[in-house]
Each structure stands twice: as C-alpha cells, then as structure tokens.
C-alpha cells in the first residue's frame, strides 16, 4: 500500500522540509503547494512510494467539500494507506474517497479497477459504507435510462431493499389506486402501458415515526414531446425524488438507526 498524507497549505513547507531535498524538489517540479486536491507523488525508481494530497485551507474546503480527492482520478487504481492522526480529517477524507469511487457501469462489459483505502483506527468504516451505499443506490437509479427504469423497475429496487433489511413493503398498482383514493397518481400515469403505483416501505418499530416521501415520475420515452428538446435529456431524473428516498432509507437501515 502507498502511504497517503493530507497536508494543508499551512503545513506544506514544514512537511516537505521534514522529508528532505528530494521531496522539496519534487514539490517544485510538480508545482505542489498544498492546494485542495493537489497531488504530490514521491517516487523511487519510477514507482510511487508516498502520496501527499493538498488539504487546502478553510475557504477552499468550504467551497468544495469533497474537493480533496479531485486529483486522485489521475492516479492508477491501487491501495492507499491513509496516514492521518486527526480523526475528523481522516473521516471526511475517507467519505470523500469512497464517494469518489462511484462509476455507473451497469452496461460496461468489464468494470474498471478501483482504488482502495486503508483507514486509520478510529474511523467508523461501517458508517461510511452505509452512507456511500445509499448514495450509490440513488445515483444508480437516477442514471439508469428511462427504458430500463420504469415503475416496475423502481418497485423492484424497493423490494430488493425491503428484502435485504427485513422491511415491510406494499404496492398499490393501476386501477387499484382509484379504489384506495390515490387518484392523482393514477391520473399522471394512466396513459402509459407501464402502470403507475404507490410504493410504501416500512421498517423499524421503536422510536419516533419518520415518514419520507419521494416523487417517482418515471419518464416514458414513448410519450409526446411537450417540452423544449434541450430539456428532454434530463427527464430521466424526474424520478429522483423516489431515488433519494430509497437511498436515504438504505442509509438509515444499514446504520440501524
């Protein structure tokens, strides 16, 4: 594993001095100053032996919360060992690193290799994984083209989630929406051959009741084009409300809140 250090702008000069002339020369060559997301790669015999990532300053981090990992996309996929004693910095970087690994590769024949991170002790990796898995579920649902993400597919995603976390799920579909007094859902989707539905997922028995509601209008690619052409490409995101609720539900259930 390649040691990886988080170095703020104010720390850069001392950190380089502690590592000697070779590191200082490398920083000059690579124009590295600790700017947020900047990568300094220290090598021996042409191989990376240590990485420093610019942690920037307070202003930079406020402007770009996850900007610290921006430069990692230029690095080959490998295992990094995070060397960081500040727990808050280590946790924030681990979350940014994990979120930065997202790729929508559902239709890819071969998924590209991904970098891995060894976190220092004290970082709650399970919590980070729960957050990231929920985020990735939301992104996958939104990124899936409309022809593969209709009401039935959205229901299937909810059922998979319910099965994984032993949650209860009920679905009201098509004409039954009128019988159960959900006329607006039925009205919006009745012209499509893909029947509209109300999906309800319930989990947990203790604590205050929290209800999350997300609109899941799955765009029908065979419908009439009533919007300006330039806006049609983003219509697959019209079900993003439901995707966000499912992703958040996954975070909550995976964290056993």
What are these regions (language model features)?
Residues 1-218, 231, 251-256:
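N-terminal hydrophobic/helix-forming segments and targeting peptides
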Residues 217-225:
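Short acidic, Gly/Ser-rich segments with clustered Asp/Glu that frequently serve as metal-coordination loops
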């Amino acid at each position: 594993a390649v040691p990886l250090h988080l170095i703020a702008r104010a720390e850069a000069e001392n950190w380089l001095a502690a590592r000697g002339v070779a590191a200082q020369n490398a920083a000059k060559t690579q124009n590295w100053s600790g700017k947020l997301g900047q990568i300094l790669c220290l090598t021996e015999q042409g191989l990376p032996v240590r990485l420093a990532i610019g942690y920037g300053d307070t202003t930079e981090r406020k402007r770009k919360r996850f900007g610290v990992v921006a430069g990692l996309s230029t690095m080959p996929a490998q295992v990094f060992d995070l060397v960081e004693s500040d727990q808050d910095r280590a946790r924030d970087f681990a979350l940014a690193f994990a979120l930065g690994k997202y790729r929508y590769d559902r239709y890819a024949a071969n998924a590209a290799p991904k970098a891995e991170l060894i976190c220092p002790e004290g970082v709650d990796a399970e919590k980070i994984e729960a957050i990231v898995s929920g985020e990735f579920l939301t992104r996958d649902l939104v990124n899936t083209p409309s022809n593969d993400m209709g009401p039935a597919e959205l229901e299937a995603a909810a059922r998979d989630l319910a099965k994984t976390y032993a949650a209860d799920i009920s679905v009201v579909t098509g004409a039954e929406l009128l019988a159960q007094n959900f006329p607006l859902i039925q009205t919006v989707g009745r012209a499509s051959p893909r029947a509209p539905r109300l999906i309800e997922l319930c989990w947990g028995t203790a604590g205050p009741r929290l209800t999350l509601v997300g609109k899941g209008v799955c765009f029908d690619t065979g419908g009439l084009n009533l919007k300006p052409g330039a806006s049609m490409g983003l219509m697959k995101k019209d079900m993003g409300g439901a995707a966000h609720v499912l992703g958040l539900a996954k975070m909550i259930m995976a964290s056993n809140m």
